[in-house]
C-alpha cells in the first residue's frame, strides 16, 4: 500500500500542476477532447461549424451583390443569411449552455479528485503520525508544532507534512520556471548576436 508520505506528496504535486497550468486551460482542453468523442454532441459541433461557414459565405455574397441593381438576388441572399444566422445563434446558445454544464461537472470532479482526498485524509487521519522524530533532537515547542494539531508528540502530523510538501513543490517549481526562462532568454540573445554582427559587416 502506498505510504502517507508519498500519497500526500503526489496529491500536492497534482494540485500544483493544475494550479500552474490553469483550471480554465485544462477545462478548455477537456472540452475540445470531449467534442471529438463519437457522441451526438460531435455531430452538433460539425453542424455548428457548417452553419458558421454558411453565415460567413452568405454575408460575403450579400456584400458582393448590389441591393439596387440586383435587388431580387440580394433579397434572396438576405433571407437565407437571416435564417442561417438565426439557426447559428440558437445552436451557439445551446453549445454554450452545454459547455458551461460540462465545465461545472469538470470543476466538481477536479475538486473531488484533488482536494476531496486531501481534506479527507487530513481529517480522518489527524491523529496518525506520518513519521516519528528522533528522540531528543528537537525541543518541546518544535515537537509540539510539528505534531500539530492532534498527532502524538514527537511525530510529524499529516497537516504539517502536507504543508511542507506544498511549500517544497512550490519552491522547486519556481526554481525550474526561473531556470527555463533564463535559458530561453540566453538562447534568444545568442540568436540575436550573429544577426547584429552580420548587419554590421554588411554596412
UniProtKB/Swiss-Prot annotation:
The chain crosses the membrane at residues 5-24, 111-131, 156-172. It is found in: Endoplasmic reticulum membrane. Residues 72-97 form a coiled coil. Residues 1-4, 132-155 are lumenal. Its main location: endoplasmic reticulum. Pfam families: CHD5. The keyword Membrane applies. HAMAP family: Get1. This is Protein get1. It comes from Talaromyces marneffei (strain ATCC 18224 / CBS 334.59 / QM 7333) (Penicillium marneffei). The lineage of its organism: Eukaryota, Fungi, Dikarya, Ascomycota, Pezizomycotina.
Amino acid at each position: 500500500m502506498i505510504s502517507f508520505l508519498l500519497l500526500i506528496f503526489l496529491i500536492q504535486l497534482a494540485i500544483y500542476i493544475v494550479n500552474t497550468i490553469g483550471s480554465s486551460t485544462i477545462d478548455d482542453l477537456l472540452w475540445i477532447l470531449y467534442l471529438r468523442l463519437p457522441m451526438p454532441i460531435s455531430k452538433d459541433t460539425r453542424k455548428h461549424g457548417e452553419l458558421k461557414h454558411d453565415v460567413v459565405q452568405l454575408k460575403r455574397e450579400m456584400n458582393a451583390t448590389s441591393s439596387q441593381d440586383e435587388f431580387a438576388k440580394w433579397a434572396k441572399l438576405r433571407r437565407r443569411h437571416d435564417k442561417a444566422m438565426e439557426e447559428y445563434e440558437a445552436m451557439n446558445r445551446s453549445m454554450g449552455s452545454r459547455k458551461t454544464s460540462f465545465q461545472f461537472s469538470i470543476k466538481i470532479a477536479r475538486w473531488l479528485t484533488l482536494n476531496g482526498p486531501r481534506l479527507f485524509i487530513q481529517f480522518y487521519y489527524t491523529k496518525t503520525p506520518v513519521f516519528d522524530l528522533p528522540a531528543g533532537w528537537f525541543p518541546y515547542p518544535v515537537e509540539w508544532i510539528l505534531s500539530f494539531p492532534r498527532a502524538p508528540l514527537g511525530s510529524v502530523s499529516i497537516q504539517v507534512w502536507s504543508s511542507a510538501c506544498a511549500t517544497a513543490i512550490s519552491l522547486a517549481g519556481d526554481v525550474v520556471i526561473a531556470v527555463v526562462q533564463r535559458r530561453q532568454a540566453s538562447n534568444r540573445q545568442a540568436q540575436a548576436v550573429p544577426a547584429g554582427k552580420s548587419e554590421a559587416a554588411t554596412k
